[in-house]
Amino acid sequence: MVTNGGETIALSALEHQNDGASSTVYYTKEISPEAMTSIYAALGQEVTGEKIAVKLSTGEPPASNYLDPNLIKDLVQQVNGTIVECNTAYGGQRANTAMHYQVAKDHGFTDIADFVVLDEDGSVSLPVNGGEQLTENLVGAHFPEYDGYLVLSHFKGHAMAGMGGAIKNISIGLGSQEGKCLIHTAGKSHDSPWGGEQDPFTESMAEAGKSVVDSLDGNILFISVMNHLSVDCDCNGNPAQPDMHDIGILASADPVALDQACVDLVYASQDDTASLIQRMESRNAIHVVEHGERIGLGSRSYRLENLDA
């Protein structure tokens, strides 16, 4: 049992928690720079190589809920990481490379690390093995220049996907502008993100995510922060105010298990989670982890390690 904001969550009762599961998700209710470095250490492995990328969302101005640079600074500098992101495909202040660099500066990310827009020079294709919707995934052209990726995600709702977590961060988040269009339309359009069907879209996210993990041969780790739990994504510059308290930080080597654990925690919270649950259910958000498990991206069952116990 953990208590956050006066609300109690029974960790042992999380729907997909299984002590015999092969995937482990680490959890702490503390949200602090120290907790970020501690949960990374708890993983028992590190992203390795000379060049490490830290993937996150830079956040759409003026008031999105992107991760606070002060929260992640120590961890980013510990791994000597370069913060990376890709341009958006739907307009806004991050659809243009020069403007995106300015947003990263304005939001404080360039104060803590180097920053690179991965698709400022276009796309590179990654093969999608075993995909039902995609045969290729177009990521930023500079994606292959990094040996390992540390993926820092802010878990929250999303207007189109229903939720945004680790899988979204490595699929839509690492997709070039052209790649984002392919994912949104399940491979039908290279130049427009609009008009796709919902389940093929979320299946494409899982398939694009798997292509990223496959290309890195597992040299990728995931940390998700469950704070500012709005129904809206950080691509929304004016998100709805959260109805619920912050939950904590989770980490795993398995993005499917990590996203599933975040969903389970939302459902298990005794807080007012109705708006976020409605957003997820109205978009069939859970389908991204269902498909992710089916294609071998990860497992929905996980063993939860409570670092506060």
Q: Could you say what each language-model-derived stretch is?
A:
Residues 1-3:
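Universal eukaryotic N-terminal targeting presequences
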Residues 6, 14-309:
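Extended, low-polarity segments enriched in aliphatic/aromatic residues
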